């Protein structure tokens, strides 16, 4: 698999679990800037977290500090960058993220540009930023630093459109891509079946991407199906090894609403 080629075992625990074909979980963080939510994710058993710069309001300073904190807790820190910008990809990784999730990738041309930004030579043109946060400011050679970061870094692209599903094989064929993360939410929106992850058309899309991942040695990720256990089990059976959970804000909101409803029923007598 990508991320370990030519450099031995990665120091990224998520990479090593994926390479062992273990099922892995990720908590998306969109709201919290506190390291305490990272401690909660760790004690809950999540393998990784991702900080959402596409739909959240994180700054680069935010995701850098949180990425380093997550790393020190044994969680793999990923960042969903806001777009395909090379600047966001490079600065996010230089700030300490162990991988990027790039939204709305629909063609092999887009995937190649992402690899160009995220990978070191010969697969990309990322430059080593010298003594830097992801290396703990260790005084090591450029060759050694590049090898460590190349083995650590996960390059994940999201397939969220009908075009992306049609191009899954070509996207998977791009050297340097590690994972295709199928976004069932946006895909179901485009198909006019919002949220219906069990629809045969969504299942066919996952199967098409799964087959492409098998052919090219990529990992298959799942997003947008967390409330549907039967669908999740089915996707695991066809090769999915990474799943994105509900966001921190949605989990908190759900808990707050449930608590308010319980108190309304047992104490205040007011319907909420």
Regions found by a protein language model. Give the residues of each.
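Glycine-rich phosphate-binding active-site loops on the catalytic face of alpha/beta enzymes
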Residues: 99-110, 180-189, 240-258
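C-terminal alpha-helical cap/extension of soluble enzyme domains
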Residues: 4, 85, 126-138, 159-166, ...
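Short, acidic/polar
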Residues: 29-43, 83-91, 162-174, 226-234
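Alpha-helix-loop-beta-strand connector modules within alpha/beta enzyme cores
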Residues: 60-94, 116-124, 147-150, 198-220, ...
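Conserved N-terminal beta1-alpha1 strand-loop-helix module at the mouth
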Residues: 2-77, 81-84, 116, 155, ...
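Conserved anion-binding
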Residues: 87, 99-175, 186-189
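Conserved, mostly hydrophobic/aromatic
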Residues: 27, 52, 92, 100, ...
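N-terminal amphipathic alpha-helix/helix-capping segment at the start of soluble metabolic enzymes
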Residues: 1-28, 138-151, 207-215, 271-272
